[in-house]
Curated annotation (Swiss-Prot):
Homotetramer. Forms an RuvA(8)-RuvB(12)-Holliday junction (HJ) complex. HJ DNA is sandwiched between 2 RuvA tetramers; dsDNA enters through RuvA and exits via RuvB. An RuvB hexamer assembles on each DNA strand where it exits the tetramer. Each RuvB hexamer is contacted by two RuvA subunits (via domain III) on 2 adjacent RuvB subunits; this complex drives branch migration. In the full resolvosome a probable DNA-RuvA(4)-RuvB(12)-RuvC(2) complex forms which resolves the HJ. Residues 1-63 are annotated as: Domain I. InterPro entries: DNA_helicase_Holl-junc_RuvA_I (IPR013849), Hlx-hairpin-Hlx_DNA-bd_motif (IPR003583), NA-bd_OB-fold (IPR012340), RuvA (IPR000085), RuvA_2-like (IPR010994), RuvA_C (IPR011114), RuvA_C_sf (IPR036267). GO terms for biological process: DNA recombination; DNA repair. Coiled coil: none annotated. Residues 64-142 are annotated as: Domain II. It is found in: Cytoplasm. This is Holliday junction branch migration complex subunit RuvA. GO terms for molecular function: ATP binding; four-way junction DNA binding; four-way junction helicase activity. Residues 147-194 are annotated as: Domain III. Pfam families: HHH_5 (PF14520), RuvA_C (PF07499), RuvA_N (PF01330).
Length: 194
């Protein structure tokens, strides 16, 4: 099992990142690849989960051990595979997910991509009482202040119905550019619709 990989972010796309570690590029699927955008110039530590089946050998990576451990727990639920686990982690915080499972809040769990009533019930059945280490809220990551135009563009995206979690994924990439509000919205929509 590979605990973590420390290296430089070589490539980022909507599904995965490539970490260059001593000249070897590791393709690592993550819930939010663009969260690694700010780490492009410095070495980054990616906590990994190695998924091996007869037809698949893949690495899944996370910013924290907590996220990685929750991903491993999600894979224990019947009906949730790696793609489903990543989608759930991309759409919510570990403490919110743990709280919903402990409180048997099926309606909240059904809001996650790919989770219907049957899967929500299975998550509660399989994970209730096993996620106490995730129930403490995680400290929010410090965010750099946004320009007025970017803040207006984000408000427009929210008005169009995009979830805050989806928008947070693309903010680091948008921050690198200086544009008008309209240009930010167009660029963001292009990124979100990929």
């Amino acid at each position: 099992m590979i605990e973590f990989i420390r290296g430089y972010v070589d490539y980022i796309c909507p599904e995965y990142i490539v970490i260059d570690h001593n000249g070897i590029g590791y393709e690592i699927f993550t819930p939010n690849p663009f969260a690694f955008e700010e780490s492009r110039e410095a070495a980054v530590t990616v906590y990994t989960y190695e998924y091996v089946r007869e037809d698949v050998h893949a690495l899944y990576g996370f910013l924290t051990r907590e996220e990685r451990n929750l991903f491993a727990k999600l894979l224990q639920v019947s009906g949730i595979g790696p793609k489903g686990g990543l989608a759930i982690l991309a759409a919510g915080r570990p403490d919110e997910l743990a709280r919903a499972i402990e409180e048997e809040n099926e309606a909240f769990l059904c809001k996650f991509p790919g989770v219907g009533k049957k899967t929500a019930r299975q998550m509660i059945l399989d994970l209730k009482g096993k996620l106490t280490m995730f129930s403490m809220p995680t400290a929010p990551r410090p965010a750099a202040s946004l320009s007025g135009e970017l803040a207006e563009a984000i408000a427009a995206l929210k008005a169009l119905g995009y979830a805050e979690r989806e928008i947070e994924k693309i903010i680091p990439a948008l921050r690198e550019e200086t544009m008008s509000t309209e240009q930010y919205v167009k660029r963001a929509l292009a990124m979100l619709l990929k």
